[in-house]
Curated annotation (Swiss-Prot):
Binds 23S rRNA and is also seen to make contacts with the A and possibly P site tRNAs. CDD domains: Ribosomal_L16_L10e (cd01433). It holds the Pfam family Ribosomal_L16. This is Large ribosomal subunit protein uL16. The gene is rplP. Keywords: Ribonucleoprotein, Ribosomal protein, RNA-binding, rRNA-binding, tRNA-binding. It comes from Delftia acidovorans (strain DSM 14801 / SPH-1). Belongs to the universal ribosomal protein uL16 family. GO terms for molecular function: rRNA binding; structural constituent of ribosome; tRNA binding. Part of the 50S ribosomal subunit.
Amino acid sequence: MLQPARRKYRKEQKGRNTGIATRGNSVAFGDFGLKSTDRGRLTARQIEAARRAISRHVKRGGRIWIRVFPDKPISTKPAEVRMGNGKGNPEYYVAEIQPGKVLYEIVGVPEELAREAFRLAAAKLPLRTTFVSRQIGA
């Protein structure tokens, strides 16, 4: 499961996820990518589930890059605990996703295989996504 090795502070404020992705919005490493067209949060479990779906479909071919990392802690209070008495403990980590962010990239497989692998991965994610390919000469 992906999570930060160390953090300066254990807990973080909720914040607001606004704007569009200005970084990580183009295919940089592979030939094909899965790009988010939606705004939201991806948990470490969702990122891993989609990665497994891609890996299983392409079998031994290709190289996969995960372009997002869950570095924001989400804290929750236990069930049936009254309000107050401080903030709950960090339960899991999420990656904040803006529209336009490339989530996964792949190289070394035909386009049709990559499309199908990303379609299976997209079913595991709570965001709308689109298939993108590298811009030649860019």
